[in-house]
Amino acid sequence: MSIIHLTTLNFSLLWTIALPPIAGTIIGYFTNDIAIKMLFRPYKAVYIGERRLPFTPGLIPRNQERLAKKISDTIMGSLLTPEELQNLARRLLQTERVQAAILWLLNLAIQQVKDDKNQKTAKILADILRDLFSESLPRLLKALARREDFLEQQINQIFDQVLLDFRLTDAQARQFADWLLETVVPPDVLRRTLIDFLTDRNIQVIDEGFREKTSGTYWVVANLFGLSNTLVRLRSFCLEEQELANTRLKEILLSLEVRSRLREWLQSLCLQNLPVSTVRQLRKTTRETVRSYIQESGADFLQNLGETVDWEQISILIMNRLQTSAALTTSLETISQELALILERYLEEDLEKIVAQAIPILSIDQVIINRVNATSPENLEMAIQGIVKSELQAIVNIGGVLGFLVGVFQSILLIFR
């Protein structure tokens, strides 16, 4: 009987000593989980009749809006500071990344142009070209034409390299001579000109001059016969025998080889044969004439030219040429690199201002508040539990160890009592 009593006593003492460490370990290990659940549970308010039970809903669901504001202030004040946002922007906007993005956009734009079935890009380009020739370029030309040296170098170069060395070829001289003799001064025009010239007064002047200024045999002929009767008869012949007179004039032109002589003379025409002073004056006159014309009529000329051009068709041709241009494809990388460098220089100067202007526009703090408020208490609890289990397991273990140590301390106190 004494042995049974002793065994019971030893078991009771052992249980008294072992229970506090075991209970402390269990309580310490599961305290975090219980505490988290107590913060969130219940998720919604519990009512008895019209009265809400105290401590419902849980602490976090009840103060979720204030918690969202605190989280937003903490993140914006400690994590996403303006300086950190600037560093983030610098990392995102590195030259290589910006260049790659610009190159991608350029390639995308070219591909969009190639896939444009309605020729929208060509229509836009046509409107730009039409405005350029009808409005912008005439105004620019009118403003530039006021300068004294406007197009001076260009006109002088054209004059020296083109006009100064210009000569008619044999074919051009032949065509020009034929045009002069057949259209400008044909035999009929010569006949009528001769009739208009041989007036009575002109015949008298010619006759008197011939009598006064001749000598020797010619003086005898001039004073005995004179030219008056001959010229009058020539005029009468041209008036009365028109067809025959035209034939005779044509024969005279052929016999005198006027066509060949005229062709040779046209071929010999060249500004280089003129004196240097004359050439200089002619160049100056040409420059002033061109400048004066541009000042007075250049704008109207460009406007009229723009109205007569089919800009839509020209734009389509330009776009088709660009789509198959190897130079455009190879130059995209260079263009993107230059644009990236320009953007980098701009950001170096104004990145702080840009970030300061972007923060209110982005409203990151409000985004955080909205996201926290939009998250249900269940999801918040699951997120915190996941963080505790994956990242803060050491705290849970320490809680168990501390609970065990507290239990051991209590057991020691019980033994000494």
From Swiss-Prot:
| Keyword match Cell membrane | yes
**Presence of the UniProt keyword Cell membrane in the record:** yes
So which domain of life are we looking at? Bacteria
Query: A Pfam family this protein belongs to?
Result: DUF445
> Which Gene Ontology CC terms are recorded?
plasma membrane
Compartment annotation? Cell inner membrane
The protein's UniProt keywords, in alphabetical order, are: Cell inner membrane, Cell membrane, Membrane, Transmembrane, Transmembrane helix
The molecule here is called UPF0754 membrane protein PCC8801_0398
What are the TM regions of this chain, as residue ranges?
Answer: 11-31, 395-415
PANTHER family associated with the record: UPF0754 MEMBRANE PROTEIN YHEB
Supply the InterPro entries for this chain.
DUF445 (IPR007383), UCP032178 (IPR016991)
User: What family name appears in the similarity comment?
Assistant: Belongs to the UPF0754 family.
Q: How does it sit in the membrane?
A: Multi-pass membrane protein
Where does this chain mainly localize?
membrane
